[in-house]
Amino acid sequence: MKNKRVIKKNFEFQEIINYKKTIKNFCFIIYYKDNDQSYLKYGISVGKKIGNAVVRNKVKRQIRMILRQNINEIGTISKDVIILVRKSVLKLKYATLSKSLIKLIKEIK
């Protein structure tokens, strides 16, 4: 089943990042842009400075799970969002990550 909420193409990432609307906190940088759909589309980027591939994939899985679990709260936001992960994510627990990410996404509204 194809997930229509995920941004995967490089040109889509570049288009949103070049739009230059950002919001930041200690563990995430979020680039965003309006879209014409009635739902949130997201892309996740974890740089190579953050651990090895196993650690990076774990962080991406956690972020995807946070977004899935909170889809009722954030699902109605009509934005394209790129989530860049900072190194401080490695020191935090899942609950803290969840609160931090959801708070940032709600601020975009």
UniProtKB/Swiss-Prot annotation:
Coiled coil: none
Key word Transferase present: no
Top EC class, one word: hydrolase
Enzyme Commission code: 3.1.26.5
Pfam family, one: Ribonuclease_P
GO cellular component: ribonuclease P complex
GO biological process: tRNA 5'-leader removal
Catalytic activity, as annotated: Endonucleolytic cleavage of RNA, removing 5'-extranucleotides from tRNA precursor
GO molecular function, one term: tRNA binding
Sorted UniProt keywords: Endonuclease, Hydrolase, Nuclease, RNA-binding, tRNA processing
Record text on subunit structure and interactions: Consists of a catalytic RNA component (M1 or rnpB) and a protein subunit.
Function: RNaseP catalyzes the removal of the 5'-leader sequence from pre-tRNA to produce the mature 5'-terminus. It can also cleave other RNA substrates such as 4.5S RNA. The protein component plays an auxiliary but essential role in vivo by binding to the 5'-leader sequence and broadening the substrate specificity of the ribozyme.
Protein name: Ribonuclease P protein component
Organism classification: Bacteria, Bacillati, Mycoplasmatota, Mollicutes, Mycoplasmataceae
